[in-house]
Amino acid sequence: MKQIFIGIIRFYQKFISPMTPPTCRFYPTCSHYGLEAFQKHGTFKGFWLTCKRILKCHPFHPGGFDPVPDKKDDKVNS
């Protein structure tokens, strides 16, 4: 499932994005953010993080540097 989403993002980057002017207000761009989110966090959390990022991409948000959060270790150290 993760590979399907990564394939969709890569298709967008290769065929759709070059036809539009660069307008992303974030670094890394939303598509690069999505790729990294899926690679770091897997399907479900990657999808959630990517959706949150795309919803922030509007003229009223200042944008800027917004990296993918690091994966939290689920183990509790005692």
Swiss-Prot record:
Could be involved in insertion of integral membrane proteins into the membrane. This is Putative membrane protein insertion efficiency factor. It is found in: Cell membrane. HAMAP family: UPF0161_YidD. It is a peripheral membrane protein. The keyword Transmembrane does not apply. The keyword DNA-binding does not apply. InterPro entries: Membr_insert_effic_factor_YidD. Keywords: Cell membrane, Membrane. GO terms for cellular component: plasma membrane. Its main location: membrane. Belongs to the UPF0161 family. It comes from Bacillus mycoides (strain KBAB4).
